Swiss-Prot record:
The record marks 252-253 as: Cleavage (non-hydrolytic). It is a peripheral membrane protein. It catalyses: a 1,2-diacyl-sn-glycero-3-phospho-L-serine + H(+) = a 1,2-diacyl-sn-glycero-3-phosphoethanolamine + CO2. HAMAP family: PS_decarb_PSD_B_type1 (MF_00662). This is Phosphatidylserine decarboxylase proenzyme. The gene is psd. Pathway: Phospholipid metabolism; phosphatidylethanolamine biosynthesis; phosphatidylethanolamine from CDP-diacylglycerol: step 2/2. InterPro entries: PS_Dcarbxylase, PSD-B, PSD_type1_pro. Its EC number is 4.1.1.65. Is synthesized initially as an inactive proenzyme. Formation of the active enzyme involves a self-maturation process in which the active site pyruvoyl group is generated from an internal serine residue via an autocatalytic post-translational modification. Two non-identical subunits are generated from the proenzyme in this reaction, and the pyruvate is formed at the N-terminus of the alpha chain, which is derived from the carboxyl end of the proenzyme. It is found in: Cell membrane. One of its GO terms (biological process) is phosphatidylethanolamine biosynthetic process. Transmembrane segments: none annotated. Catalyzes the formation of phosphatidylethanolamine (PtdEtn) from phosphatidylserine (PtdSer).
Length: 304
């Protein structure tokens, strides 16, 4: 009964207004009041401040500064093996596995299509038919910067307006097409492992979604799909390395990764609800050509 009430409230509450209010409040610099709010939040959600570059909560001017806090250098080592991709964020796996033609599992008895997730872009959708996906949920206690699973060159960024349902196991199991309905930022990369999509999904009280190359992508929420294309090289190119920060959430939410067919395989033992840490191995190369190229690069590496 309680779950039904929670889901009903998700449909009834003015989510955009609440999100705007939360974003406004989280940006306020209110001195001791800000510190009290941060201390209360850290206590309720058991945030490990010893991992933060600034463990003293008084050092954060606003709640958002605290929420996107950087970690101490080296606290999240990135798996060094060149044939491995790493988790982009701290959190827990919501779902993962094979894409069934164009259908992605959201929760038991719920799925959604690639085209719906990718805002109707059938060209990008076709790249990932029968591929693999990983959905990572970031809880309030987690580190909320998002990193690159592997080296990548950005080709497209697409902002998709949408709903702002909360994202958690309850809504995933009860709100159809949750990730294809919520506001999101889609990033398509060329990588050594073939095309890869990394999607930052918004939610209720997610004040903003940012990328390192474009800054704040949302807000403003203008209600229209926006697309930016990027060159492979030269001025305007966005070239990132494995483990580099690529974006961040201010209050939220979920990261979805898509991989092309027969390019990578997920690491053994991963399952729904597995805890993730940025930099730990998520998948490894499956394509023999990729492995051969990586081996050749290692053989010619002259680094002392």
């Amino acid at each position: 009964m309680l779950d039904r009430i929670k889901i009903a409230l998700q449909h009834l509450l003015p989510k955009v207004w609440l999100t705007q209010l939360a974003g406004w409040g989280a940006d306020r610099q209110a001195g001791m009041l800000t510190k009290l709010v941060i201390d209360l939040f850290a206590r309720i959600y058991k945030v490990n401040m010893q991992e933060a570059q600034q463990p003293d909560t008084a050092s954060y001017r606003s709640f958002n500064d605290f929420f996107v806090r950087p970690l101490k250098p080296g606290i999240r080592p990135v798996d060094p093996l060149p044939n491995r991709l790493v988790f982009p964020a701290d959190g827990a796996i919501s779902q993962l596995g094979a894409i069934d033609d164009d259908r992605i599992l959201q929760a038991k008895q719920h799925d959604y299509t690639l085209e719906a997730l990718l805002a109707g872009n059938y060209i990008i959708s076709d790249l990932f038919r029968d591929g693999l996906f990983v959905t990572t949920y970031l809880s309030p206690r987690d580190y909320h910067r998002v990193h690159m699973p592997c080296d990548g060159i950005l080709r497209d960024m697409i902002y998709v307006p949408g709903d702002l349902f909360s994202v958690n196991p309850l809504t995933a199991a009860n709100v159809p097409n949750l990730f294809a309905r919520n506001e999101r930022v889609i990033c398509l990369f060329d990588t050594p492992f073939g095309p890869m999509v990394q999607i930052l999904v918004g939610a209720t009280i997610v004040g903003s979604i940012e990328t390192v190359w474009a800054g704040v992508v949302t807000p403003p929420r203008e209600g229209i799909i926006k697309r930016w294309a990027y060159p492979m090289e030269g001025e305007g190119a966005v070239i990132l390395e494995k483990g580099d920060e690529m974006g961040r959430f201010k209050l939220g939410s979920t990261v979805i990764n898509l991989f092309a067919k027969d390019r990578v395989q997920l690491m053994p033992g991963l399952a729904s609800q597995s805890v993730t840490r940025m930099g730990e191995a998520m998948a490894e190369a499956l394509d023999e050509d990729i492995l051969a190229r990586m081996s050749a690069n290692d053989d010619t590496d002259t680094t002392p």
